[in-house]
Amino acid sequence: MLFRSGLEERISTRVGDLRTDKFGGGYDLVLISAICHMLSEEENRNLLARVYRALVKGGRVAIQDFLLRADKTGPRAGALFSLNMLVNTQGGASYSEYEYTAWLREAGFGEVRRVPLAGPAGVLIAARG
């Protein structure tokens, strides 16, 4: 997709273990897409802290995933998917916008903004101050 869009010179990707690898630094944007639901709360906190350290000042993280309401009973697709994660992963679940926002703030990020998407998922964007 990067080659088709002509962005291969502007976007870099890396292979690694998101649970343990150090990401280095100097990034303007880190995209975490359909990942956080596979991780426990502790693993997500650790991931976001490492992402924060990898970003330049003003750099952003974008998290795309199911975003549950605070009571975690919906939207329906995200709540049902959370059951799947609870059964099939060691600690994964769908998380609420409130939980993500708390983790992002704990890691040091500033304002958190939600971008609605068509369908059951959403995007949260936060900047490193």
Predicted stretch roles:
Residues M1-G129:
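Alpha-helical subdomain
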